[in-house]
A protein has these predicted regions:
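Membrane-interface amphipathic segments in extracytoplasmic regions
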Residues: 1-194
Length: 194
């Protein structure tokens, strides 16, 4: 993003396509951790403003689940993931029970904890700014103005707002544990399990 002297860390299912479009990048999605940019070009990584968008872990998880069920971006790996989910679960609750574990979320970027995209191994942020998906309509204009970015942000790939499925206390507890650092580091309250 040389034009804007910024590096956008695109965490899946967090309005990344909207930001990429606003910045004029139509080269496709590129979901890598912030450390990758640092290794590839340390000079620009230190010089440019680095930012990402985070989202409530449960809402992001449900969005990734729905997206995956539909075949994701249509790639072979996304189709295989859809088949795996469909053959091992029949709804979101059974997906949480049957598939959602540390191995699964580390194996599939759509489900990978957000902190792994933007934090160093000591959990310190490796970027300059964290924006929140839930507040993006309010946060983006001031952020864009400060960094000379396009002020309008057209939300694309946005799914209809649906109520999250009701889960059991054990399922909520599992999500809280798997995404503990996302809740802790980005200011989200863990899901009430009572």
């Amino acid at each position: 993003m040389h034009k804007y002297k910024c590096i956008f860390i695109h965490i899946p299912k967090n309005a990344g396509s909207s930001v990429m479009k606003a910045l004029g990048d139509s080269g496709g999605r590129f979901h890598v951790e912030s450390g990758y940019y640092n290794e590839v070009n340390d000079y620009f990584y230190k010089k440019y403003h680095r930012f990402a968008i985070v989202r409530h872990p449960l809402e992001r998880l449900f969005s990734a689940y729905k997206y995956s069920l539909q075949g994701g971006n249509g790639s072979q790996s996304d189709k295989l993931l859809a088949d795996k989910i469909k053959s091992n679960s029949h709804d979101f609750a059974s997906f949480v029970d049957a598939l959602l574990d540390m191995h699964f979320i580390m194996q599939h970027k759509l489900f990978k904890p957000q902190y792994l995209f933007v934090c160093k191994s000591d959990l310190a942020l490796n970027i300059d700014t964290v924006l929140h998906f839930e507040k993006l309509a309010d946060q983006w204009p001031a952020f864009a103005k400060k960094h000379n970015l396009p002020h309008s942000l057209e939300f694309i790939n946005r799914s209809e707002k649906v109520s999250l499925p009701i889960l059991t206390s054990a399922q909520y507890k599992k999500i809280n544990q798997l995404y503990y650092f996302d809740f802790e580091l980005f200011g989200y309250t863990p899901i009430d399990v009572n």
